[in-house]
Amino acid sequence: MTMTIDTICKTLGLSHEGTVSVSRDELASLSLALVEQGASFMFMYATDDRARAGTFTVHAVFSVPRDGFFTLAAALPADRPSYPSLTRTIMAAHWYERLMFDQFGIVAEGHPDWRRLMHHENVPAGTHPLRKDFAWNTRLGEAQEPYPLHEVEGKGVYEIPVGPIHAGVIEPGHFRFSVRGERILSLEGKLFFTHKGVEKLVEGKSPAEALPFVERISGDMAVGHALAYAEAVERATATVTTPRARMLRVVWNELERLSAHVFDLGNMAGNGTGFSFMAAQGFRMLEDLRRLHEELVGHRYLHGAVTLGGAHDIDARGAERIRDVLAKTERELAEILDIAFSTDGLMERFETTGVLSEDAARAYGARGIAARASGLARDARADHPYAAYASLPFLPVVETSGDVAARFKVRARECAQAIELTRQALLALPSGGESVPLRASRGSALGWAESFRGTVIDFVRLDADGRIDRLAVSDPSFMNWPLFAEIGPGNIVPDFPLCNKSLGLSYSGTDL
């Protein structure tokens, strides 16, 4: 008999947003059962529970839109931490399982690709930094471990190595193209040159002490990360924020989205195709928004906009300034988008380039723009409303062609949506306080937010003193970088920068 999500939950005693313990041998089969009945794989993380239970634990998180999050947790023996791989049937798990081996030494048996992920060649074998007995300031020895890149052989096939250092002002990443003529046959990326050790560095810190680390996971996504983290900490401590704080969080989330999308629209059309008019106008409009951010919260990238238990307040003058800048941005954006959409040379570069099919987007667990431009209406604001989104009219923006043009259109439409949501939030802003103190307590919980790149999910566990025992972060870029294996091949080499900019991913957000 085919199991439904309801029957699975009933069988396991699993409640919404709950965690259920399963055996190591059940984890893969139950995970597949959830996916086959409509759940989406979202996140995997591990915890070192040797001190309390003598085990490591692997957690697999799933989402059912408008229903809840489900976590399956499998305890593994400390002397042999292994389990049957999920990747064999759920492709979206493949990077997480490689990452958990690098971090904890946990083996996903049967995984098809056992190369390193986070660790580069100079990290000695047996280095697992998220184990509790590994100190953050451990000095590593010298090593030169192999990291073989895939090779494509055939007549006329050659390789083009790009990076990790690039000509533009971007972060480091290496890409290896296998090419015949100008046509890309295969594309593989090697990232993780920007490792900061955030999840390790926050261990033992208070939630407030950890917040600045979280805000800096990805420089342009301070609100998205801070919001997911704050919601996790607040759930873990049973802290209930005020209605005003929840509505303020909508404002900050949408202002960050608007500024990022304005930048990406200019970057895609300008630096991606040479249509420099769009770059100049997009970057000029971005500067107006950055100056507004600094005027409102004292930081151009909105650090401090989200606080634990609340949000930075907005007075009447600040609200009026936001409305003025939104009106100007809306008017100017409409003008430049009209020019962009009526420029045949630009749209011809966008259309049919970098196509990601709906099936591939679903299989890889795509998030954000990448998912919605390929026909998947995935958006945490609608699927799992947080902050005050449940009280605002909202439907995800979806396109279906899956190409660069679709990703451009989704961003353009989401700019208009962000402007309208911000206006609605300011109009509905309740009176009252903007923050409450955290309740100091031991606990654990998930938190999430829909950043401009996609869904951020955090797991937070606090110890008996209310300090961070484990922070696990799922950044949307981590899920979306593997998409290049799908959108790169079949295109010509000069279109790769355009494909890259159309996804607009973060190197730093991927490499915590």
What are these regions (language model features)?
Residues 81, 94-102, 227, 256, ...:
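Short alpha-helical basic/polar micro-motif
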Residues 398-490:
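Substrate-recognition/cap regions that form aromatic- and gly/pro-loop-enriched pockets
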Residues 158, 162-267, 271, 294, ...:
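Active-site- and interface-proximal helix/loop "cap" or "latch" segments in soluble metabolic
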Residues 45-47, 266-271, 302-307, 348-352, ...:
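Short coil/turn segments at secondary-structure boundaries
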Residues 78-91, 218, 397-411:
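Short histidine-centered catalytic/ligand-binding loop motif
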Residues 218-342:
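Internal, well-ordered alpha/beta segment that forms a basic, Gly-enriched binding/recognition surface
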Residues 278-282, 292-436, 442:
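Intrinsically disordered, low-complexity regulatory segments
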Residues 1-183, 325, 342-353, 359-362, ...:
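Terminal low-complexity/charged segments
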